[in-house]
Regions:
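Non-catalytic signal-transmission and effector/linker regions of two-component phosphorelay proteins
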Residues: 1-9
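Two-component/phosphorelay signaling modules centered on CheY-like receiver
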Residues: 15-33
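Acidic, metal-coordinating helix/loop segments flanking the phosphotransfer/catalytic sites
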Residues: 34-51
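Conserved phosphotransfer cores of two-component systems
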Residues: 45-48, 69-76, 96
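Active-site residues of response regulator receiver
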Residues: 12, 55, 82
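A short, hydrophobic beta-strand element within the central beta-sheet of small alpha/beta folds
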Residues: 75-85
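Receiver (REC) domain active-site loop signature in two-component systems and cognate sites
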Residues: 58
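Acidic catalytic/metal-coordinating carboxylates
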Residues: 37, 62-65, 70, 89
Length: 96
């Protein structure tokens, strides 16, 4: 929590996606942090973040490796955004 409000970190390489999610979530009263890629998400990760929303397909560090690194230090839930729908992608998401 940050300033008494739930805090959500959104990592997506598409600015439009980040902006839409940020506006929707801030409108519901959440504090929203954003990151352009997995590397930035890892750098922004903190105990005050209550939920991570990570795009699976990002340059530099993609969502799955970013989630694994974040998970080493923090226990907040992680939601993945993806256009992928294969069984292996679903399994990978649950294994992080």
């Amino acid at each position: 929590m940050k300033n008494g409000k739930y805090c959500i970190l959104i990592a997506d390489d598409e600015k439009e996606i980040r902006d839409i999610l940020r506006l929707l979530l801030e409108g519901e009263g959440y504090v929203v942090l954003t990151a352009e890629d997995g590397r930035e998400a890892i750098a922004e990760a903190a105990a005050e973040v209550d939920l991570y929303i990570l795009d699976v397909n990002m340059p530099e560090v993609s969502g799955f490796p970013a989630a694994a690194e974040i998970r080493k230090h923090f226990d907040a839930p992680i939601v993945f955004l993806t256009a992928y729908s294969t069984e292996s992608d679903k399994v990978m998401g649950f294994s992080v």
